[in-house]
Amino acid sequence: FCKAWLMDHGAENAFIDEAKNVIYEYNAENDVPVAIFMAHIDTVFPESVPLELTEKDGKWFCPAVGDDTANVALLMLMAAYVANEKPKTNGGIVFVMNSCEEGLGNLKGSRALNARYGKRIEQVISFDGYLDGIVGMAVGSLRYKVTVKTAGGHSFADFGNVNAIERLSAIITE
């Protein structure tokens, strides 16, 4: 949807990369420095959760509308404006509706952008959430995969043996 909408609104070179990011590059050819503006298109909700939009007193309500659908819509409008007005810029602008930001996505979309643009990136501005503030620093994420194997498990058949769930719970509380 995002790619088709961008193309219908003047951003003919919009594309989807291998990480499922929707990208529109403006004056970003060759090795020019770029500023990346992004908002994420994934949500924490599984596909089985209905995302029903309702309106009350002039406000929209829907799971994920604040994280991050509203920002995606604004970013798409900004990209369309730039595509049509063609402002003069000192470097490239990259508009990204990035994927795999939430949950198990492990920032796959952001990491793909870093791999694609690398040292050309002068700044990254991510529109995320709906709070009344600005975070002016990089935000990091560390992910760990922990495997715990024990002899115990079932509360009846393995009674008295160490239980993996209990051990994981102890790690979390520490």
Segments from the language model and where they lie:
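Acidic-enriched catalytic cores of C-N bond-cleaving enzymes acting on peptides and small amides
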Residues: F156-E174
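Acidic/His- and Gly-rich active-site-bordering loop/insert found
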Residues: F1-F61, Y81-N84
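Histidine-centered active-site/metal-ligand motif
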Residues: H40, H154-F156
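Acidic-glycine-rich active-site phosphate/pyrophosphate-binding loop
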Residues: D42-E55, I121, G136-T147
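Short, glycine/charged-enriched secondary-structure capping and boundary segments
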Residues: E29-N30, P50-L53, K108-A112, A138-S141, ...
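Acidic/histidine-rich catalytic neighborhood of metal-dependent amide-processing enzymes
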Residues: W60, A64-R143
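Buried hydrophobic positions in well-ordered alpha/beta secondary-structure cores of metabolic enzymes
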Residues: L6, Y24, F37-H40, L75, ...
